[in-house]
């Protein structure tokens, strides 16, 4: 056997790519040579065998041994004579020959398939016309050696024709190439090349592509589109003649580079160039695959002419290529590895450019030979081969990855190149930035799309609402859980409040701030402000005081409408008049004011600002009137419709909820505060009120869909007629799931705050949804009197399919930014296509689709939206940089794991900090400071300290290199054993979206929570064909412990999780005891595992039924004593005080939205039975658990919960607090904090020292996984102190 050789040059990459690919023939290369003339086929067949025998790489065998791949020359391999096939009598000789060759290529031709890696056929299709088919595996040849072998066979054939001996082999043994390559890898030259490419990478611009699909995450494909562009009409030749000082190859390259740059909308980009890697090397005459594709930056100036571009490219590229050739032996794969890029990351380059210098001409007397390429191996994006010929013409062959391109698009792109050449032929002095890439007819197409002119009346919101109220005075207009107003009654309330505003000094043109919870009074307040001629300024009471103060300082409203409990938050805002409003007013019978004018500002909404300060967007009456009239025309409401108001008033989508129903005679129903965050609450809300029209942010739609079963969808969604989505990209798969579950029509809307809510629309159901090919539904077509423009960097329109910057025009544009004329001027610019008009740059990147709709592709800056909330990462960065001892700070949005993913946008904010002093930062304390300044949706869920921020090759921040927060076991243990442990580990992985290779991996530390525990139990029950309960998952939450239980006796473990002691985690240090809430179960505390340091044990204390302390005790003191007897414990209302009385140390006492029993009337609650809200909460939990376990949950659990709730009320009727002389930490649920309730006052008689952390959630959510994202780190920091 010959010497075993390692794989070298391109071979390792080819081997690995084939192993990872599921395509059977991706790495085969093939062409056929069309021979016209008299051919001696048997003699040519002999020449083929002789020629193949001279190239030793064609006799290579490959084997894998202990992870290493070896190759050797099989000297015993004998090539058979190629088959000669005569198709002259066939009906379609050419088609049949093509089918034969393609059939060969469609076989499994992988290197280990057993099929020949080398294959030739001679197919006669006519007298004196042959197809010589040749196919090789890419491990044996490359694009240089393939034609070289063909030429050598032709030489042998000619010698045989002349009766001469077979010419000697011109090919170098591949062993010489391997030896030389190994020496190179160990040489200083390799080190110099590595250093050269490190520096090259630093200067390299980003890659570009003609496809809108991202380059990252896409693999090469052997499914390829081929397009040959022939420029034989003389225009390239004419241009070359006019530019006589420019080489034809340089001109061809300049035209192609400019064409790519303009169609990519990127004038600086990285392209791939093919290097032979043979000159001065043993590989010069070897046949193995040694070609290299290396990155090179292309730089185009918009203000230069084509001759200047060609000359500069030629000069610069010549110098650059000369340097690169000295370092061309360095593997492209090694450059990628050196850059730190992982598989699936963005590649170094997109399109590959290749000016063909390989000689495909065959010198056979009396025979013309033309080569036709069939397969060249996989293509990542585009490969362009340029063929400038000796006649002065140009042809370009395009190979395109079919996963990224379609044939009509490629043909259009080819037409644009022809048009580009024609423009330069007509005017060689034309600037590169001014050349037109729009095809004839495309301007008219875009003009037709934007032909949205519709005459609308000159009116205002208040006038439209008053007009409808006069038509249907007795129809129901506005309702919440407590009130119902007819149109007449609502109008009377609005006028009464508007007059009160006037009395308080509000004048037309003023602004009025509103800080009210969601109720009928919020709607009435907004309408009254408009009635008084003012603009409303919504204040989200969930925002920190500092941020609200900034908004008020900038807006300077003439009045604040709020409630008594919120008023203290604004006490330090100077010169702010206030009005507390939470009850109906007595109608005065006054005439309507209707002081608004069409030119007035209707509302001011603050959005995130990159400067670190929020910016107020002012939207006028005419803009929002246009938006509402369009919506009523396009999606008409009637008096039978019920519209849900569930969007927070600080989000501009709420505007149409507050006003659209009242211009159409429909009814608006107000969801309870924060109900929009609870899918089960929304199900009940829709069903109770018969809602027909509602809105979801896509991520909340995903959560709502996840909560539905076919049965609950029929119950809660049956009345829905139209559902709207906006605020984020809308996943097409989510729409399909919604359609299958509910059948309710879904509509995608798009628009920034700066353009009256929405400016475009697209159906997200039915036939339109079926035609969506991308991952997201298009943002669609413009609304009335509005235009969409997609422009390149030179402000030229881009053609369909080409990515560009999205601009908005028309009547709906905002008036500007409050008090920021500089920012207004920079974002609302003059419209170059409509003199005297304005245009707003959205910062969104988009493209036109063939049907005229717009597809959103992403952002061109650091702004993003998460669950509909606009976020400027720069604003968070600046606030973090102001924190103590922080030198550098950056924010990144990422999916931490899949446990929280619901099919929508699962990204969360992570903050990265670099310390000024180099000392460890107290990230929990810093996070608490951020909550005092930033609204909840802008506070990173976790802060990570880094020694330094990662930089990309060009010295910029490399966001992709920022580490993800690790939610995993602290130290690796043994691997799961085959059997139960392996099955359980796989179940963990599938539910949590992370790799589980440790038998001690904890389900909750990895991101699980109680609902996911339900799903896990249901899944394992099916897999093991025995009942696995959620309680067992709670108690035995690691892979190994759960396997032990499942493999043990079923009866003995069934009560696990339902006992008094709930061991949630075992550590080697102190223990945190978690007392059950009124439900009697402590399962919700399972998520604490992911926040507390590993030495902490976590134990839940429960009250199961029957015989639990809550059921058997006559008063709360007995419950406390019973639990104290079970374990030394800390808990309000007695346990902590009892421990102190016994002389025990209480290191930490935590209270989760807990209040002294003396602050409420528990006797009245007991007399009235279980609170409806409590029953609703239990029902929501039941529905969620049933959905998680697919209906298999026992009713016993919820019977116990209901019993415990009733007992809790009974026990609290006689309970009395006991003073505690230590320190406690109280977490207050702000959203359900009763008016006038002060936690400081309520607890001051009973607790000596109290730390209070206000949480942006409701009481029912205080122990939810979402709440523990904020609470968990605070508990950890407190315990560590």
Curated annotation (Swiss-Prot):
<dbReference type="InterPro" id="IPR001031">
    <property type="entry name" value="Thioesterase"/>
</dbReference>
<dbReference type="GO" id="GO:0043041">
    <property type="term" value="P:amino acid activation for nonribosomal peptide biosynthetic process"/>
</dbReference>
<dbReference type="GO" id="GO:0047527">
    <property type="term" value="F:2,3-dihydroxybenzoate-serine ligase activity"/>
</dbReference>
<keyword id="KW-0259">Enterobactin biosynthesis</keyword>
<dbReference type="InterPro" id="IPR029058">
    <property type="entry name" value="AB_hydrolase_fold"/>
</dbReference>
<dbReference type="InterPro" id="IPR023213">
    <property type="entry name" value="CAT-like_dom_sf"/>
</dbReference>
<feature type="domain" description="Carrier">
    <location>
        <begin position="975"/>
        <end position="1050"/>
    </location>
</feature>
<feature type="region of interest" description="Thioesterase">
    <location>
        <begin position="1070"/>
        <end position="1281"/>
    </location>
</feature>
<keyword id="KW-0511">Multifunctional enzyme</keyword>
<dbReference type="InterPro" id="IPR020806">
    <property type="entry name" value="PKS_PP-bd"/>
</dbReference>
<feature type="region of interest" description="Adenylation">
    <location>
        <begin position="486"/>
        <end position="891"/>
    </location>
</feature>
<dbReference type="GO" id="GO:0005524">
    <property type="term" value="F:ATP binding"/>
</dbReference>
<dbReference type="InterPro" id="IPR036736">
    <property type="entry name" value="ACP-like_sf"/>
</dbReference>
<feature type="region of interest" description="Elongation/condensation">
    <location>
        <begin position="1"/>
        <end position="301"/>
    </location>
</feature>
<dbReference type="GO" id="GO:0009239">
    <property type="term" value="P:enterobactin biosynthetic process"/>
</dbReference>
<protein>
    <recommendedName>
        <fullName>Enterobactin synthase component F</fullName>
        <ecNumber>6.3.2.14</ecNumber>
        <ecNumber>6.2.1.72</ecNumber>
    </recommendedName>
</protein>
<comment type="function">
    <text>Involved in the biosynthesis of the siderophore enterobactin (enterochelin), which is a macrocyclic trimeric lactone of N-(2,3-dihydroxybenzoyl)-serine. EntF catalyzes the activation of L-serine via ATP-dependent PPi exchange reaction to form seryladenylate. Activated L-serine is loaded onto the peptidyl carrier domain via a thioester linkage to the phosphopanthetheine moiety, forming seryl-S-Ppant-EntF.</text>
</comment>
<dbReference type="Pfam" id="PF00501">
    <property type="entry name" value="AMP-binding"/>
</dbReference>
<keyword id="KW-0963">Cytoplasm</keyword>
<dbReference type="InterPro" id="IPR010071">
    <property type="entry name" value="AA_adenyl_dom"/>
</dbReference>
<keyword id="KW-0808">Transferase</keyword>
<dbReference type="InterPro" id="IPR020845">
    <property type="entry name" value="AMP-binding_CS"/>
</dbReference>
<keyword id="KW-0596">Phosphopantetheine</keyword>
<dbReference type="GO" id="GO:0031177">
    <property type="term" value="F:phosphopantetheine binding"/>
</dbReference>
<keyword id="KW-0597">Phosphoprotein</keyword>
<dbReference type="InterPro" id="IPR009081">
    <property type="entry name" value="PP-bd_ACP"/>
</dbReference>
<feature type="modified residue" description="O-(pantetheine 4'-phosphoryl)serine">
    <location>
        <position position="1010"/>
    </location>
</feature>
<dbReference type="InterPro" id="IPR045851">
    <property type="entry name" value="AMP-bd_C_sf"/>
</dbReference>
<comment type="subunit">
    <text>Proteins EntB, EntD, EntE and EntF are the component of the enterobactin synthase. Components probably do not form a stable complex. EntF acts as a catalytic monomer.</text>
</comment>
<dbReference type="GO" id="GO:0005886">
    <property type="term" value="C:plasma membrane"/>
</dbReference>
<dbReference type="Pfam" id="PF00550">
    <property type="entry name" value="PP-binding"/>
</dbReference>
<feature type="active site" description="Proton acceptor; for thioesterase activity">
    <location>
        <position position="1259"/>
    </location>
</feature>
<keyword id="KW-0436">Ligase</keyword>
<dbReference type="GO" id="GO:0009366">
    <property type="term" value="C:enterobactin synthetase complex"/>
</dbReference>
<dbReference type="Pfam" id="PF00975">
    <property type="entry name" value="Thioesterase"/>
</dbReference>
<keyword id="KW-0067">ATP-binding</keyword>
<dbReference type="Pfam" id="PF00668">
    <property type="entry name" value="Condensation"/>
</dbReference>
<dbReference type="InterPro" id="IPR006162">
    <property type="entry name" value="Ppantetheine_attach_site"/>
</dbReference>
<dbReference type="InterPro" id="IPR001242">
    <property type="entry name" value="Condensatn"/>
</dbReference>
<keyword id="KW-0547">Nucleotide-binding</keyword>
<comment type="pathway">
    <text>Siderophore biosynthesis; enterobactin biosynthesis.</text>
</comment>
<dbReference type="GO" id="GO:0016779">
    <property type="term" value="F:nucleotidyltransferase activity"/>
</dbReference>
